[in-house]
Amino acid sequence: MSGAEEAGGGGPAAGPAGAVPAGVGVGVGPGAAAGPAAAALGEAAGPGIPDEAGLAGARQLQEAAGDPDAPPKKRLRAAEAAEAAAAAVAAGSGKLEERLYSVLCCTVCLDLPKASVYQCTNGHLMCAGCFIHLLADARLKEEQATCPNCRCEISKSLCCRNLAVEKAVSELPSECGFCLRQFPRSLLERHQKEECQDRVTQCKYKRIGCPWHGPFHELTVHEAACAHPTKTGNELMEILDEMDQSHRKEMQLYNSIFSLLSFEKIGYTEVQFRPYRTDDFITRLYYETPRFTVLNQTWVLKARVNDSERNPNLSCKRTLSFQLLLKSKVTAPLECSFLLLKGPYDDVRISPVIYHFVFTNESNETDYVPLPIIDSVECNKLLAAKNINLRLFLFQIQK
């Protein structure tokens, strides 16, 4: 096995062998910097010599610390990291992984990426979460997203993944939060979930109400002494009733969906929300779909961010709400149930929620109702995309 293959073992898939050299060259544009991937090889300079890798990492952190647009906490963290990196370079000491930390960290959150790594045209690195967040913020502020280091334009088409850095980061050692032993980052998740003897686990009698949480190596002793298996039926009934309530709510939702699927008139279509701006002095972002036809009627969907609050880009919590509008005329009230789900080619996580409304010529639009996205991270994924693609189901209720 070659040295390059050994360095990449256990990391994320990097495609065919011919694709690796393209990932190693971090810069992708004219005048691009050598970048962190090349800097990772700076260990060849040997201990005691201030190699280019350490100097580049220290300079990068110093730039982040001096950025007037950066939040105070980030500037403080960057300053501390820059001092540590500069001291390590000056002394020519410290473990390789400690020196690589400042070189391979994300330029936004200053932490080592946990998954995909993106780079701007000048080679500055961003973890997937920060990259998506920058694009979402730019969409909310109606600005072009830029790299926080060099201010060059960034987008999904301009930026690319850096497979060399992803593989290098996956091989760096990381400490298990339970047993405090060190493992390659690519193996740490499996160790914490399946192998660590100190990982937090639950009693097998949790189904009958046992609340015990503890280290895995104590599980056998606890289960042997657990009092729940010896409880009477009456004692267990109260516990089981509470646990069944959440299950009943979930089953009620799915039973409602199955009931709707038995209706005579059902329609569904793929809808594409496109971003627009209001005509206000301070414009606000909103989304609207082109007109579409379902159940022989013409409809439009609209959506807004954080209920159209003034500065949603300043909020860490992001939500989307939507309304359904009937654009065609009806001769009688049109009673419908509807729900939005993810499209066939998207990976956004949306919980199904059924909404109900009676459409008339005088009342032809619903109130804004929440789009049941799992969390703000999923919302940022939608905002970062050029368009939002979902699937709408409409059920006409006939009396």
Curated annotation (Swiss-Prot):
Region (Disordered): 1-20
Zinc finger residue ranges, TRAF-type: 152-210
Zinc finger (RING-type): 106-151
Annotated keywords: Cytoplasm, Metal-binding, Zinc, Zinc-finger
Entry GO terms, CC: nucleus; perinuclear region of cytoplasm
Top-rank taxon, per record: Eukaryota
Signal peptide (residue range): none
Residue spans of biased composition, Gly residues class: 1-13
Family as reported in the entry's similarity comment: Belongs to the ZFTRAF1 family.
Any Pfam family matching the protein: Sina_RING
Description of how the protein assembles with itself and partners: Interacts with LGALS3.
Single Gene Ontology MF annotation: zinc ion binding
Subcellular location: Cytoplasm; Cytoplasm, Perinuclear region
Protein name listed in UniProt: Zinc finger TRAF-type-containing protein 1
Cited InterPro entries: Sina-like_RING (IPR049548), ZFTRAF1 (IPR039338), Znf_RING (IPR001841), Znf_RING/FYVE/PHD (IPR013083), Znf_TRAF (IPR001293)
